[in-house]
Structure formats: C-alpha cells, structure tokens
Amino acid sequence: MGPVMLDVVGYELDNEEKEILQHPLVGGLILFTRNFYDVEQLRELVRQIRKASRHRLVIAVDQEGGRVQRFREGFTCLPAAQSFAGLSDNLNGTQLAEEAGWLMASEMIAMDIDISFAPVLDLGHQCAAIGERSFHEDPEQAKMMAEHFIKGMHSAGMKSTGKHFPGHGAVNADSHKETPCDDRPLEVICHHDMSIFRDFIQRNLLDAIMPAHVIYPQVDKHPASGSSYWLKSVLRQQLGFNGVIFSDDLSMEGAAMMGSYVERGQTALNAGCDMILICNNRDGAVSALDNLPLTKVEKLSELYHRGGQYSLNELKNSERWQQANKALTALYEQWQDCAR
C-alpha cells in the first residue's frame, strides 16, 4: 500500500474522496470529530471507506482520552493520561491504565478502525500541545502507566503508536501553531525524554512511532519529523526500531518550514518516515498525490487490527467492558471536577 494517510471532510464520502481513495499512494485514512455524528453513521462511513479504497487501508483516529478523544457520544469518555498517576496507589493506577487501553482499543475495533495514535510518551505537562496527555513528568512513572496502557491495547488486538519521538514535553510552544525549538543538549534528551522510547523499543512494546515537529538545534537543524539523523541514525540504527514511522500531520505549522506540501512529504519520506499524514488541506494532499513518486510500504499491513469481529453492542454486553466503563467513567468525572 502507499505511504500517504489522508482525511475526509464530513459524515460520508463525496465523489472526489471516493476517487482519491483509489490513488495508489493512499495507504491510510484518519478520522476526526467532524466525521462523527453517532455510532451508526460512523459505522457506515467506515464501511464506505473500505468499499471505496483500492485495497485495505489503515484507518486511524486520535482516541487518547481526556481532551483528545474524537468520538464521544456512544463511546466511553476516557480519562486523561495524567489522571492515572494521580490515583492513591500505583497498583490501582496501572490496572485502570491497562483497562483504558483495552477498552479504547476494543471500542475502536468494534467500528473496524485499526489504530488509535496512542499512547503519548512525552514527559511533563508544561507544553500547551501536550499537557494532560502526558502520563507523568517522571520517566519511571510514565513508563509504568504507559506500559500497562499498551498492554491493554495489545490484548484487544490493536497496535501501539508511541509519540512524539524523541520528546515534545520540554517545549512550551504548540507545534500545531509554530515550530517549537528544544535547546537542550543531546545527552539530556537521550537520558530523560528518550529513555521511555529506548526501553519500550528494547521490550518490543511499540509497533509504530510518530516523531515530533520539534527542532532540537543542538542536535540537528531539521524538525525530528524531517530529520534523517533522528529517524535513521538514532531511531533505526542506535535504538533498533523496526516498526512503522508515521509523520505527524504535515499541515501543522510545525512542519511548514519544510516547504510546500510536496516538499514536506518528500522530506519526511527521505528522512525515514514510512507513512506521512496530510490532513485538513485537500489541495495540499492532492498536490502530494500528484507529485510524489509511487512507492509501496508493505509493513503497513502489520497495523491492521487483530481483534476479531464483534459489534459495539456485543462489546458493551461483556462483563469486562461494563466493569471497565464504570471505573473509567468515575475517574473521568473525578478528573473533570479537579480541572474545573
């Protein structure tokens, strides 16, 4: 399949989108809140996508929990990653983190969605783009919670995506709006932020990784998402990562310094990304499809969900879902009360 992941505009496919999904460069599609009205509509949209595409696409969503959860009505409202470490004991926190990973993945698989881009492995809560999406500022605490979240995802049949390599948590700027710079030296980044990625790669916990649209000027002049140093020299060679590398959305301002959409896509692919995301700009996406060279990335098929076939109603009738839903809803409400 091709190396480009796109989006669609609304609740159902239009004729142009059906044509675009036939393009040999298209290998994936990401869904947003604007694509969701209710469970039945979402199920029909996914069915349309499967029918319209040339081959099976990787269908993705950001269903992390907390403020980043694209589908809410009819699904469990998932607590933010930060909330798990705030519980009175680590055992309860890790158990709930695992159930959150399992429940999130199970609900998405019930809709025939392959992956949620999760978990966030960035450290700390100061960054505007990260905040409560981070499990903890301490690497060991973050590892403990994230490991159990991934364990839950895997048990449901969903692959994990760690983001945002080598770490987005130490900058205040939001890469959706500008290109952040992290001025720390390489040894600090490697020892602190990157330690969770290194550990999880060694233990085969990460199936995919998404690099940050962040520049680390003491290391390389390019954002990590377009840096062959970070993706090839560090991630592939030094850390030995063999999974899928996704770019973050190339329409974000953090990627704008890489040039036009074609230039952004080519830069990210040349740097080592296996699949590039081009969202929220149809003209940019079409330009990339028209001008990028035809390539195939066979390893993307490894990201298809392995959860079997069941409906959302069948899932909700299971005892595990009911218990997990009750506990996670209570934590979600508790966290919302604390945030007010």
From Swiss-Prot:
Substrate binds at D62, R70, R133, K163, H164. It is found in: Cytoplasm. InterPro entries: Beta_hexosaminidase_bac (IPR022956), Glyco_hydro_3_AS (IPR019800), Glyco_hydro_3_N (IPR001764), Glyco_hydro_3_N_sf (IPR036962), Glycoside_hydrolase_SF (IPR017853), NagZ_Beta-hexosaminidase (IPR050226). It catalyses: Hydrolysis of terminal non-reducing N-acetyl-D-hexosamine residues in N-acetyl-beta-D-hexosaminides. The record marks D174 as: Important for catalytic activity. The active site is at H176, D248. Plays a role in peptidoglycan recycling by cleaving the terminal beta-1,4-linked N-acetylglucosamine (GlcNAc) from peptide-linked peptidoglycan fragments, giving rise to free GlcNAc, anhydro-N-acetylmuramic acid and anhydro-N-acetylmuramic acid-linked peptides. This is Beta-hexosaminidase. The lineage of its organism: Bacteria, Pseudomonadati, Pseudomonadota, Gammaproteobacteria, Enterobacterales.
